[in-house]
Each structure stands twice: as C-alpha cells, then as structure tokens.
Amino acid sequence: MYAVVVTGGKQYKVAEGDILFVEKLTADVDSTVELDNVLLVGKDNGETVVGKPMVEGAKVTAKVLAQGKAKKVVVFKYKPKKDYRKKQGHRQPYTKIQIEKINA
C-alpha cells in the first residue's frame, strides 16, 4: 500500500517503512505525527483511491526520528568594480520521519 501526502507544501509518495526528510514539523523526537492531507491511496489489490482534493478518512502515521538542519547553502552577492561583497549562509531545518501505518 502506498499514499501521496502533502506536508510543508510538498508532495511525497510514501509506503510503510519509508524514511523521509520533510520540512520542519513541530514535534518532539520519538513522538508520532499524523499526516491527514492524503491526495491518493494505492491499495495492494491494485485499487487506487484519488481524493477530490483529499481522500476522506485517510491518515498516514509517522514516527519522528530526528530534527536537524541541512547542509549550508552560501549566497554570495557582489557588484563588480564597486567593492560591494555580501556573503550569507542558510541552513534549512528538516524533520526525519519514518512511515509507520497508512489508514485508508
């Protein structure tokens, strides 16, 4: 069984046991989160349920494995011949989750 869920403005195709890096969720490590924005559910018998826009009554339960930050992205701006240089870094926060159960 698989599902397509929306979290953090992005869509992910997930199955039970998958490990994902998603945009930061406000949850503690080793807690469970429910993702209820399910767009599509594919069952083992080949049946596919498509939501309009969400599948009613469908939930995906996931366990939070870690909270962290991605690698640093360096933004460097400059203007030639004007002695203007600006260096800025950014590390995007993420949440590492493992899909435990898909309820449809």
Curated annotation (Swiss-Prot):
Protein name as catalogued: Large ribosomal subunit protein bL21
PROSITE patterns for this protein: RIBOSOMAL_L21
Gene Ontology molecular function terms on file: rRNA binding; structural constituent of ribosome
Annotated family: Belongs to the bacterial ribosomal protein bL21 family.
SUPFAM superfamilies, A to Z: L21p-like
InterPro entries: bL21-like (IPR028909), bL21-like_sf (IPR036164), Ribosomal_bL21 (IPR001787), Ribosomal_bL21_CS (IPR018258)
Name of the gene this protein is made from: rplU
Gene Ontology biological process terms in this record: translation
Keyword Chloroplast carried by entry: no
Function summary: This protein binds to 23S rRNA in the presence of protein L20.
Subunit structure: Part of the 50S ribosomal subunit. Contacts protein L20.
Keywords: Ribonucleoprotein, Ribosomal protein, RNA-binding, rRNA-binding
HAMAP family found in the cross-reference section: Ribosomal_bL21 (MF_01363)
Keyword RNA-binding: yes
GO CC annotations, alphabetized: cytoplasm; ribonucleoprotein complex; ribosome
